[in-house]
Amino acid sequence: MSTQFNSNLIWTLLFILSCSKNTNLYPDPNTIIKGQQEWQKKFYFERISEFKNEPIGKNKIVFLGNSIMQGGGNWNNRYKSDNIVNRGISGDYTAGILKRLDEIIFYKPNSVFLMIGINEFFADNSEKPEVNPENVAKNILKIADIITKHSPKTKVFIHTILPINNDQYIKIKEVNYNFLQDNYRPSINSQVKETNSILELNGRYEVIDLHS
C-alpha cells in the first residue's frame, strides 16, 4: 500500500512540475522586441495567448514564421495531415521568433519549417544599419541553430524569403501602414535575393527555394 502511495505521489509531483514548466514557455506581455510597433505587438501577444491555449504537443510538424505561415490557417487541410501546427504570427520579425522558441524546444517537434525575414525589410531601415541581408540571414540561422542545439532530433527546413510585388507594395503604402518605409525603395527585392543567397550557402540546413 505504501509503495503504491509513493508511486502515485511521484507521478502527481511530476505532473505538477510539468504543468508549472509549461507556463514559462511563452514570452510575457512585457517582453520587448526591437522594432516592434503597437499593431505588431497586439497581434504578437494575441497569438501567444492562442498558443498557450493550444500547445504544440508531441510528434508534430511546426510551421514557424510570419503572416505567410499564419495565413495558411489549418495547414493540415492543405496537406491531408493531422499533425501540423501553425506557429505563424502576422508582422513578426526574426527577433520575435527568437523570443518564442522555448515552446518549440520543449515539445521537440519532428520537424520545423521556418519562413521569416521579409518584415525586417518592410520596416524603415534607413537608420537601422543592423537591418541588412547579412544580419537577417544570421538571425534566421540562429533560430535554426537554437532549435537544433536543444532538440537535435528536430529537422529544420528554411524557406527562402518571398519577394514583394512592387505595384501592390505602393498601393498598400497608400493605406498609411506605419511599418512600411516612408520612402519607397525598390531595393527590398534585392535585399531579399541577397539574404536568400546567404541562406542557400549555409551548409547546415536544407533550404526550400520558393523563388529563385
Where does each model-flagged region fall?
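Short amphipathic alpha-helices and their capping/turn segments at secondary-structure boundaries
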Residues: 49-61, 98-107, 144-149
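Residue-level preference for long, well-ordered alpha-helices that form the structural scaffold
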Residues: 93, 129-136, 181-192
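Substrate-gating cap/lid alpha-helix
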Residues: 166-210
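Structural recognition of the beta-strand scaffold that forms the well-ordered cores
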Residues: 61-63, 85-88, 111-115, 155-160, ...
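Oxyanion-hole/transition-state-stabilizing segment in secreted/luminal serine hydrolases
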Residues: 70-83, 94-138, 146, 157, ...
